[in-house]
Amino acid sequence: YVISTVYMENDVLGFGQIKDRYQLALDLFDVRLMIEPEIVTWACRKATKEQIAKLRELCNEVEMLYKQGHNHIQKDIEFHSYLAKLSGNMVVERLIPVINTSVVIFANITYRSLMQETLETHRAIVNSIEHKDPVGAKCAMNMHLTYNRQVIMELLEKKKKVRKNHEPDDI
């Protein structure tokens, strides 16, 4: 299961040149933790009923694809991109390529290891926005990103151990 790198086409920040994909994914998640919880608080304030219905539809599509074993990445990117759009902030909308890069890199590294957590936190984000609950939306997004970040941290730790075990002794 290989995910296309077509999302790197707007690579104005040069992420495609970075060799350490694990560290890049971690750093991108750190940036997402700085930005996305605020995005959903703004979405709570600004989203219309029609927009919330579309967000729920995207959430359901991600879930259906994920559960059926299909590639859900494009829909997941649409979900997060739509959240950014709902914030009503044109700068945030232009930050979408950074967010999309993170989703693709993370999916390549972890391949479906957080399905249940992803589905539950996506639903919690949508429900919180629907109920105009910015604190709930922010908490759900923090949980979503923290689960993902933790997996990256564990993978980085394993990678470091493998490297250490393959280094010659300094005797």
Language-model region placement:
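Short linear motifs at protein or domain termini
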Residues: 1-34, 41, 162, 169-171
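Short, charge-rich amphipathic segments
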Residues: 8-22, 52-54, 73-78, 149-153, ...
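Conserved amphipathic alpha-helical segments that form helical-bundle/coiled-coil interaction surfaces
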Residues: 28-108, 117-126, 136-150
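A glycine-/small-polar-enriched, mobile loop at the entrance of the PLP active site in fold-type I
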Residues: 111
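Short beta-strand-centered segments that line the small-molecule binding cleft or hinge
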Residues: 114
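Conserved short acidic donor-positioning loop in nucleotide-sugar-dependent glycosyltransferases
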Residues: 129-132
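C-terminal effector-binding regulatory domain of bacterial HTH transcription factors
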Residues: 135-171
